[in-house]
Amino acid sequence: MAEIPQDLVYTRTHEWARIEGDAATVGITDHAQEELGDVVFVELPEVGSSVQAGEPFGTIESVKAVSDLYSPVSGEVTEVNTSLEESPEKVNEDPYGEGWLLRVRLSEEPDLLSPEEYARRLEEEE
């Protein structure tokens, strides 16, 4: 079973958000990185650009496939994880830590899945 940290909220498309006040850190879930396989490239938006909940904000490329990344939150990108340019494997090695993708200043309250709701969704997919 994939790791599902209890301090995060989740999307149906396997992204997570760590909400801290009016900001969020965003990444993909352990389940998503397992399904993708070895990540070889991540394309992220520019700092200062806007992201919209449920809309694509970049792509992630693995040895198996290229997939869109969907934002769990709406707001302005304040930081991107530039270390992924040189070390995209961090997404596989530590998806909830060093493999984070971007930080966003929230423009609205996100409507996301609790850890329990996300776990049930994974069980339904199996």
From Swiss-Prot:
Entry GO CC: cytosol; glycine cleavage complex
**Which is a GO BP term held by this UniProt record?**
glycine decarboxylation via glycine cleavage system
- PTM N6-lipoyllysine: at which residues? K64
Question: Domain Lipoyl-binding, which positions?
Answer: 23-105
- Cite the Pfam families for this sequence: GCV_H
Keywords from the named record? Lipoyl
Does Calcium show up as a keyword for this record?
no
Cofactor binding remark:
Binds 1 lipoyl cofactor covalently.
How does the annotation summarize its subunit structure? The glycine cleavage system is composed of four proteins: P, T, L and H.
Can you name this protein?
Glycine cleavage system H protein
